[in-house]
Amino acid sequence: MSHSINGHFTPASLLKFAAPSIIMMMFMSLYTIIDGIFISRFVGSNALSSLNIVYPIINIVFAIGTMLGTGGNAIISRYMGEGKNKEAKECMTQFVVISLLISVVILVLTHMNLTSISRILGASDLLLADCDSYLSVVVSFAPAAILQCLFQSYFVTAGRPNLGLVLTMIAGILNAVLDYVFIVVCQMGISGAALATGIGQSIPAIAGLLFFTFSKGSLHFTHFRLHLRELGQACYNGSSEMISQLSNAIVTFLFNIVMMRLAGEQGVAAITILLYGQFLFNAFYLGFSIGIGPIVGFQYGAGNKKELKNIHRIAFLFVGISSVLLTIAAVTLSTPIVSVFTHDADTFRLAAPGFKIFAINFLLSGLNITSSGFFTALSNGLISAMISFCRTLVFIVLSLLILPTFLDLTGAWIAIPVAEFLTLLLSTVMHVRYFFRPGKQNYFI
C-alpha cells in the first residue's frame, strides 16, 4: 500500500488514484437520485416531496459515517505513514464498532417516534403517510449506510480503492434494478424505493466487513483497546464533513419550509430536483477529496513538503477546470435534466428555469469542497470545519432567510450560489494564510 501513495504524482496518476473514490461517491449519490426518478415517474410528485421531507434523518446517518470515515482515515493514514501499523488497525476497528452502535441508536429512536419526526420535518397531511412509509424502511438500514460511508474511505487507505469501486457499482446497479422491480412490477410505492436503497447499501457494507475481517494486508480488524484521544481527533478532523451532512439536513428542512410556503407541494418537488443535481455534482468533488486524502495525510505524516505542494497544485487545477466545464454542461442541459425527474407540468414549470440559475453554484462548490477536504487530510479540523460550517449552514441559512423575502422564488434559487461565493472568499483567505504566506503555519515550508 505504501508504494501506491508514497511516490511522486503527476496529474494523470493523481486522477487515476482518486477515480475509484469519485465513482464510488457518485454511485452512492445515485441511490437516492434513482429513487427520486422512479418515485416521481411511477408514484407521483407528492411522493417525491415526501422523500425530501424525511431526508434530513438520512443526512444524520451519513454525517456520522462521513465524520468517522474521513476524519478517522486521516488518523489511520497518518499512523501508517509514520510506520505505526498496529495503532492504525486498532483505530480503524474502533471507529467501525462505534459507528455501528450509533447507527443502532438512530434506528431505534426513529422507529419509536416515526410520525412525530415526519411532522416536525414539515410533512403536510397529504404527505404524511408517504413520509412515514419511506422513513420506516430506509432507517432500518442505517447500520449498512453508515458502514458504507466508512469503508469507502478505508478501502482506499488499505490500498484497494478498486474493490470499493466495484462494490459500489454493483450496489448502484442492484438498487436501480430493485427500484424497477419493487416500484413498477410489485407496485410497492415509496416503500419499495426505500427497500431497494437499503439492499443496495448492504452490499458494500457486508463485503467491507468480510474484507477487513479476513484481510492479510496491512489494514484489517483486530482486537483493540479504546483509543479515546484518537476517537476525539477523528471526530475533530472529520467535523467539517459531519457539519456538511448535518447542515444538509437543516438546509433541506428550511428549503422544504420555504418552498411549501411559496409554491406548495410542487415547490418542494421542484427544489428536490435541484438538490439532486447538487447532490450528484458535490459527490464528484467529495469523492475526489476522499481519494486524495490518504495521499495528503501520508505525505504530511512523512514530512514530504515538496510532494504535498505538488499534490495541492494538481488538485486545484483539476477542480477549477472541471468546475467550469461541468457548470456549462449543467446550464446547457438544464431542460432535459429536469425532464428526467418529472412529467408533472407544474413541477417542470418551476424547476426548469430554476435549475439554470441554481447551476451557477457548481462553478464554485468544487473548490470549496476540495479546500475543506485538504485541511481535513492535514488534520487541521478547525479550519476545515470553519469552511464547511460557513459553506453548508451559516451562509445558506442567511441567504434563505433573506433572499426569498425580496426575490420570491428567484431568491430561493440563488441562495446556494450566494453561499458558495461567500465561502470561496473565506477559503481563499485560509489558503493564502496556510499555503502561501511565509511562517510557521505554512504547510509547504
What are these regions (language model features)?
Residues 21-74, 138-145, 232, 236-298, ...:
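Transmembrane helix-bundle signature of multi-pass secondary active exporters and lipid flippases
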Residues 69, 137-156, 167-175, 193-206, ...:
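Short runs within selected transmembrane alpha-helices of multi-pass transporters and secretion channels
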Residues 30-33, 42-45, 79-82, 157-158, ...:
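Helix-loop interface residues and adjacent transmembrane-helix termini in multi-pass membrane transporters
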Residues 48-108, 145-163, 270-334, 365-387:
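Small-residue-rich hydrophobic transmembrane alpha-helices
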Residues 1-18, 76-141, 185-239, 296-361, ...:
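Short alpha-helical transmembrane segments in multi-pass integral membrane proteins
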Residues 28, 32, 36, 40, ...:
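Juxtamembrane/transmembrane-helix interface segments of polytopic membrane transporters
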Residues 60-63, 175-180, 205-209, 279-283, ...:
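Hydrophobic transmembrane alpha-helices of multi-pass small-molecule transporters
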Residues 35, 72, 113-114, 151, ...:
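Hydrophobic/aromatic residues in alpha-helical transmembrane segments
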